[in-house]
Structure formats: structure tokens, C-alpha cells
């Protein structure tokens, strides 16, 4: 079974054929999936850039157990827990792939072997996401494994954003991404981490994650706050993906600092340079850097083993996959930080 969006605004569970693996692939039986509040909601609404073919199979945050491997596979073994499994091609079943990770069985590709044999190219049907289809250590349980799909994307962006230990940052938005920047930033060794959100309850969650200060958008826009901040932030991070958010923090970034956008923006964002220092670096991170995302898992697994990072800090809702409509309704109502569904 798999979760299908038959047309924008609709969602259903449909029976499809179990994927047939090739020599470079492993078959994974899904244990748990997680909703990506932004991407999955946009795909359901028909508003994800570049995706306009329906029906499509939904989902890209997946964890499960390897149950079969192709003859050329070296980096997956039966019994391993794997993350990032997808279905890239549904063949003649009349379904397009919106990554297809919300499926009972998914496929992972042995990217390293594909690369060695010169097959890791788009012309050979290789997606960039194959690089981050990996196993996780045995101590990483299903909830941590599936939430790692979010964590590793965020931690993988630290290098792109020029974030180094000790830096002072302010993050706008306290959804799963914004809170991941806070939690992982503290574990990574960033200095002061402040957060901005409209809702006091979300600011309190951010403080529990390690944020030093929480502010509303109105508070950071006052002349008094801007004067007191005195352009002292090494980096400002937009964890929402809106130009109005970037403009709200441009007065806070230091000369030569980093303005970091994590999210998909509209076609023509407008930045008010009158609010910015003469020199700053703008980083647009609308797609993961796969090599950094993959490397981040080693650090995450260590933090999980040490008990310093737990999925329970992020998961607010748990459902069975048959309750997928209820899960998305909760997301739409704004109740969900992170939601997981079991198969």
C-alpha cells in the first residue's frame, strides 16, 4: 500500500505492486514515516514548484528494515535499518512519484557502487537523493531514524551557511526546521542562539530546546531592539522561506555577516538593501547539499547514542498510516511540530 494524492486537495491509500529491485538496489519494508509539514502539504495542495503531474505517490521521510538486496549491493545488508527509501518509478501503474516514501515497501540504491561503476548520473536514472539512502547504526531506533531525515538536512546546511562554533545567530521560525537549528546548533557549539516566532507557546518550546532568547516579529522590529542589537549577529537564518522574513532581520546582521535562507522562495523575492549592511553574504539553501547531508548522519548518530538528541523532543503526534488524513488535518490546524506514522 502507498499514500496517493490523486489530484490536488485529495489523499488516499491505494494498493500498488511491490517494487522489483535491480542489482544495485535493496528492498526495504517500511517501519515508520514522518510528515514534512511544508513539502508534503504543498504537494497535496498542488503548490510545490515543478510538480504538476497527478496522481502522485507521497513522502520522502522513511525508515525501515532491509529485506532483500541485489547482487551488486555492498552497503546494505538484510536486517539493516535504512533511511531515505523511495519509489522513483511506478512503471505502468498510472502513478507519478512524489518520492513515494509513504509506501509499505520502498527501494534504496547503493550509491557508492553506482558511482564506482559510472552509473551515478541522471542519464542513468540516478537521482541525487540516492546519495542519502543509507543505513543507520543499530542503536538508532525508528523514531530517531525517521526524524534524522530532517535533522541531517539541517545539520548539513551548517557548512553552506558558514556556521562555526561560537557564532551568534538569530533564527526566524520555530517549526521543525527552526527548532532543529536551535537544538543542533547548541550541540554543535554555536554561541548565542535567539529565535523569533509569532506564537509565545512556540517560543517556549524553543527555549526548552536551548534558545537563549525568544522574540516576536514585532519586538525585533522596534528601533530600540535594532539599536541594542547593534548589528551583532554573525548570521541570521530564515527558517520559513519568505522575503519579508529576510527583510525583518537584515538590520541585525553584522558587516560581512551571513544571511541564510532555508526554504523554497517564490519566483521574485524582494530584499530591502537599505536595511542591510554594505557587505553581507546571501545563502539560498532551497535544496540539500547531499554530501553534507550524508556526512551529518555520523554526528547525529553519536549525539543520539550519548542521549543528547531525542526524537521525543520533536514528535508531537503519532498515527497509523491508515490515519493519514487525520494526520494532515492536524498539520493544517497548526497543531503538529513533527508527526510520525507507523505501517
Regions found by a protein language model. Give the residues of each.
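Mid-domain Rossmann-like dinucleotide-binding core that forms the NAD(H)/NADP(H) cofactor-binding site
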Residues: 138-219
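Short N-terminal strand-loop motif that marks the start
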Residues: 1-58, 118-128
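C-terminal substrate-binding/catalytic core of Rossmann-like NAD(P)-dependent dehydrogenases/reductases
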Residues: 226, 267-317, 325-326
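NAD(P)H dinucleotide-binding glycine-rich loop of Rossmann-like/cofactor-binding domains
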Residues: 89-168, 172
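Glycine-rich cofactor phosphate-binding loops and adjacent beta1-alpha1 units
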Residues: 161-165, 209-283
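C-terminal capping/lid region of NAD(P)-dependent oxidoreductase domains
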Residues: 230, 260, 264-267, 309-314, ...
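Residue-level recognition of short, solvent-exposed, well-ordered loop/turn junctions
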Residues: 22, 77-80, 164, 254, ...
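Glycine-rich beta-strand-centered segment in the early N-terminal region that forms part
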Residues: 19-34, 47-94, 98-112
Amino acid at each position: 500500500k502507498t499514500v496517493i494524492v490523486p489530484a490536488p486537495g485529495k489523499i488516499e491509500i491505494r494498493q500498488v505492486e511491490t517494487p522489483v529491485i535491480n542489482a544495485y538496489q535493496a528492498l526495504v519494508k517500511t517501519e515508520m514515516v514522518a510528515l514534512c509539514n511544508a513539502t508534503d502539504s504543498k504537494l497535496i495542495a498542488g503548490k510545490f514548484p515543478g510538480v504538476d503531474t497527478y496522481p502522485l505517490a507521497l513522502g520522502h521521510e522513511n525508515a525501515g528494515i532491509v529485506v532483500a538486496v541485489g547482487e551488486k549491493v555492498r552497503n546494505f545488508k538484510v536486517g539493516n535499518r535504512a533511511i531515505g527509501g523511495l519509489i522513483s518509478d511506478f512503471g505502468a501503474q498510472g502513478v507519478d512519484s512524489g518520492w513515494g516514501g509513504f509506501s509499505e515497501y520502498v527501494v534504496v540504491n547503493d550509491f557508492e557502487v553506482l558511482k564506482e561503476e559510472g552509473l551515478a548520473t541522471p542519464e542513468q536514472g540516478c537521482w541525487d537523493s540516492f546519495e542519502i539512502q543509507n543505513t543507520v547504526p543499530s542503536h538508532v531506533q525508528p523514531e530517531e531514524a525517521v526524524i534524522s531525515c530532517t535533522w541531517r538536512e539541517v545539520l548539513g546546511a551548517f557548512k553552506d551557511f558558514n556556521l562555526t562554533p561560537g557564532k551568534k545567530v538569530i533564527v526566524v521560525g520555530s517549526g521543525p526546521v527552526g527548532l532543529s537549528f536551535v537544538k543542533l546548533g547548541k550541540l554543535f557549539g554555536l554561541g548565542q542562539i535567539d529565535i523569533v516566532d509569532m506564537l509565545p507557546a512556540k517560543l517556549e518550546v524553543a527555549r526548552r530546546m536551548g534558545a537563549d532568547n525568544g522574540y516576536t516579529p514585532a519586538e525585533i522590529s522596534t528601533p530600540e531592539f535594532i539599536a541594542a542589537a547593534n548589528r551583532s549577529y554573525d548570521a541570521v537564518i530564515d527558517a520559513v522561506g519568505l522575503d519579508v522574513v529576510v527583510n525583518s532581520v537584515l538590520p541585525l546582521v553584522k558587516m560581512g555577516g551571513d544571511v541564510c535562507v532555508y526554504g523554497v522562495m517564490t519566483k521574485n523575492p524582494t530584499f530591502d538593501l537599505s536595511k542591510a549592511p554594505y557587505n553581507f553574504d546571501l545563502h539560498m539553501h532551497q535544496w540539500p547539499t547531499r554530501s553534507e547531508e550524508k556526512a551529518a548522519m555520523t554526528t547525529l548518530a553519536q549525539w543520539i547514542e550519548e542521549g543528547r538528541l531525542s526524537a521525543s523532543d520533536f514528535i508531537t503526534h503519532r498515527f497509523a498510516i491508515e490515519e493519514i488524513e487525520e494526520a494532515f488535518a492536524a498539520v493544517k490546524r497548526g497543531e503538529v511540530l513533527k508527526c510520525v506514522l507507523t505501517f
